[in-house]
Structure formats: C-alpha cells, structure tokens
C-alpha cells in the first residue's frame, strides 16, 4: 500500500502536502508547531487536520506492519504463493488481512484438527470434490478404523464434515461476502434480561438495521448489556445467506450435495455467524467510539476556548448540604484572598448567618461576580445567592459554573502541591472560581476525561480517549499562547515541545532567577535544548519583555523578517510595543514579492502582519461572552412558547443541552436545531454558544424541558 497516496486520497490533499507533513512529523515536530510555523510546507493545513493525519498515518503503518508479519508467517510455513501474496497486497483493512491469515494461523485443538489426526482429510477432499463412484457411505467405509477412534461410517462422514466446515469458515472471500451481506441486510437486536424499570427501557425489545445503527444507540446497548439489563445480538438473514453459500459452493451435478448442505449449515451457524457477530459488533463499537470521541473532542475544544472573564474579583461557592458551602474569594489574577464555609442549605439552614458573612466579603474585597458550582445543592445555593444580591448596593452578578472535575483536581497531587495548606473542599472552591476567570488555565489541571462533556466516555478505550483529548488540550493551549512568567507547570506541560519534567524545570528557573526577560533565556533551562526551543518558543509570550516581538506569536526564527517588514512599512519595534502598527496589508503592493524579499512564504507573512497589528491577541475574545445572571428562574416559571437566552452546555449525537437558568438543562432535539437537515448537531451549534430558544414543553415530574431553536 502506498501510504502517502492513501493519505492524499483520504484527506483531499496534494502529494507535496502529504509528503511534507509526514516528513515533518517523522522529524519529531509537534502538531501545533507544524500547523503554526510550517504553513508553506503543509499548504496551511490546520492543527485538527494534521492531528487526524498523524493518527491515520500511525494506523496505516500499523496495518503495513501486520501485513508484513502475516506474509512472513505464511512464508515460514512454505505456503506463500504468488496469488496469496497479491491478495495480501490488495487487502485494505486489518479484517481482510486477518481473513487471509485465518487458514494459516496456529489453532487450538478443534473438531476439524481432531478429525485430521484420525486421517479423515482425504475423505473430506473426496466429498469436497463432489464426484463419487458409488455413495458417500461407500467412500467412507475405507476410513473406518477403530484404532483411530473412527468406529463407524457415520463417524467418518461426521469427521470429514467437521474438516470441511472449518475449511469453509476459513475462506477469506466467502467471509467477506457474508460480512458485507450481514451488514447490508442484518440488524442489531436487543432484549431485556430483567423485568424491571431502567434507563434502557427503549431497548427492551429493540431492532435497528445495521446500516442505520446510530453510534450513541450502539454504545447505550453495550452499556445496558454490560450492566445486565440487556442481551444484544446481531441477526443476519440466515436462510438467504445459507442459499448464497450453497449456490457458491455446491455444483449442480454434485454427488455430495446433501452432505455439503449440512456442512454449510454447520459451518455458518457454529463457526462463521458467531465469529462475524463478534467482528461486526467490535466494528460497530469502534466506529461509535470514534464518533463519540469526535464529539467529545469538539465539546472539550469549545469548553477550553471559552472566553475568560478577566479583571473581576470572584467569590466562588462550592455548594453542599450537610458539610456546608465552601467559599473562596479570588482576586483578578486568580490569587485566593480568603476562604470560609457557610451553611445556608439544609439541614442547617443558617441563611441569615451565611448572608451576613458573604455580604461582608463582597464589601471587603469588592466582589464583582459569584461563581456557583453546578453540583449537589446548587439549586438551593442559587436561590440563596439571588436573594442575597438584592441586599447589596454593589452590582454583583452570578454565573453557574460547570464544576465537573473540580473534586478530582482538589484531591490530586497537583492540587495538594498548589494549595498544601487548604482543605480538599476549599481547593474545589478555588478551582470553581478560577475556571470562570480563565477556563483554559484552570481546566488543563484536570484529566480531560473528568471534565464531563462527552458521551459514554467511561465505556470506551481509555488509552485512545486519553490520547485524543490530550491532543485537543495541546492544540487549544498553543492556539491561545502562554505567559511564560505566570503559567503553571500544568499549563506549560501542554506547550509544544515541553513535557512535565521541563515544565517543572521552567518553574524552578523562575524561582531561582526571577522572571524571564527574553525568550532566548529558555535555552538556559535544564533539559530544554535547541529542538524543544524551536517547538515551544513561538507559543510562549513575555508581555513585559524589552523585545516587543517576545510579546507576540512571531517565532524567533522570523524576527529578522518581522523587523524587515516593519522597516518596509515605516514602523519600528517601538511601534509594536505601543500597539501603533496598523494597515500593513495596504502598505505592501505585492505579498508574494514582499515575502520573497524577506525570505519567508506568504502564509508566514500574513501571520506576522496579524501579530504585529494585534500583539498578544487572545483568539478567545471572538467567542460569545458567558451569560451572567442576577435573578433566578424555576422550572415552574416556564411556559410553553416562552423565549429565553441560554448557553449550550453539552452537544451529543441526538441534540444539545442548553442551560436556560433553571438548574435543569433543556434538550433541543437535533430535529429542532435548524430548518435545514443536519446529520449532527455540531454542523449548526457548538458547546459554549449563546443561543435563543423557545420552550416546547415542560415535564415537572420527570424534570425534562423540551426546547426548539426554530421559528424564533
């Protein structure tokens, strides 16, 4: 297989794009570095495409490795023919390669191998030849041998049938045909195994064609089966498939047709069907997991790239009942100022005392915003806060923060290192406050799998999920850029070219030498060599550096070009520092000529111009601002037809959940997102979007809210 050609076809890219991107990856360059600083070589492929290409490259190389292993194994048996080698070369998937290898794979002792040990292979060959002199029984008499355990003619025929059944099940072309037919006409079927209510009730008597099986339903059935509520199986059109096999394998003039029909039925029911069922279910699950990981990736990307609410003093409230609500007041830089615990919720209900304490904190520190975690007791805490805010003269608003993962962080080694003197619960409160001020900087401290914006994330391959989500975090961190002098080791470890040990060395260097004053100073950090510097330098910013270009996303390798461009346009570095640079595109007549003159490509020229005009620009500024509230709404207040503004909290295969401020997210089904047909909600909306929705229905008993985004 020509891997480069395959990548070209699958990604719709040119030969040079494929060759250059693969070469850059093989040279050890990181995805963010390639996407940002090697655009001329990749044809400006973005980080998501390059990451997908990298994953596909690994998969295709693994496929080639397996092809080589199989070819070697067959050759060592002395059974590799030209036809077999050609078949192996033509195989496009792992399944096809394994089908070809199946007859040659070392097997455990089977009914067929036992029959072969008894000397019945020649009889099997006679029956398979389908031309007899006399009857099958007469042919079988010669193989009766009590010493071999073949006591009767029937024993001989049955043994030969076992050999042929396995032989048929090992036919790669036949397996491919049956697999394709099953997928085309078969169904996934689930039945209940327990006569009791559960979240899987819709699957208690469920059937869906395989070619239409939705990924989220496949994963739901898998979970229901794992938890003991469902039995799940693949059903093919057995009679139709048996007829196809008979037409393919039995000649019209066959003298052994009746025996072969029995062989075919046994081969299909005992060997082929169970094997195909496992393969098809594994394939369905793998595809469903990949789709779910894709949604999780996009949700995580949008969550991490939520705009920070900067410059505000935040009072964070981590709700609870018996143990009280943990409070942390955090200044505009994220530094905790004071922590305490109040008890406004049941069973203590010390509302007046809690109110007095929090109002005092609001006045003492000039609190601008209250961040309330959305976990246990969140609703009661929100009601308490809304009432309390009516009693302060300051303009204070509140926001409901997604606290998923806060408890994981607070109990982690990282949480203990950051706040060794704080109780675990108070660390959670600090995290809830900080993730409003700068979601990216805070959320990188938490395992992405714990952030809770995916479907069935605990049911899938955790290694694959971890790799995929880690890539998303890396891309987000590098697209925003990191302040070298303030970033935590957790944030630094996601910067291109920097791993956890180097991140700690950067922190150690800061502690020993004070703030970095220039990017090139990074080369003095232990274990950070020239290659790592090349990868990370452009993503690390120094807002106070005397070198204005250190404050931007311009890579040090392009400083000379940037200064040359400034000179051509009548500017200097002082203008960059003073943010006076503008209209560069109008000042150069030909981008191609200017780029050539500066020794760079046009894409790099365009990136440099953007950075010089808006040094240190945060791409998150373009996202819609979070919805802040000052009063509370309850489900009982909702009326059919009411139009509200909300924030998309989660995107899943069948719709989106929207926070409309009633503590119970409403569901916009995929059919209610827009007037045009969409295959997936992500085609029209993403996590963090601020949207207008209309209430379709409210079920107070089941706590369900149905919303629409159509006709507003």
What are the residue ranges of the model-derived segments?
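Long, charged amphipathic helices and adjacent flexible linkers at domain junctions
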Residues: 279-297, 450-481, 596-640
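Low-complexity, acidic/Ser/Thr- and charged residue-rich accessory regions of DNA metabolism proteins
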Residues: 139-147, 151-153, 206-207, 242-272, ...
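Duplex nucleic acid-engaging cores and interfaces of nucleic-acid transaction enzymes
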Residues: 49-52, 59, 63-316, 320-410, ...
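Long, charge-rich intrinsically disordered scaffolds of nucleic-acid metabolism proteins
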Residues: 96, 399, 405, 410-480, ...
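A glycine-rich phosphate-binding loop feature that marks nucleotide/adenosyl-phosphate handling sites
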Residues: 179-188, 317-321, 375-377, 401-408, ...
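C-terminal accessory/binding modules appended to enzymatic or scaffolding proteins
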Residues: 12, 307-308, 474-508, 630-668, ...
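Accessory alpha-helical DNA-binding modules that contact the DNA backbone or grooves
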Residues: 30-31, 42, 46-147, 479-622, ...
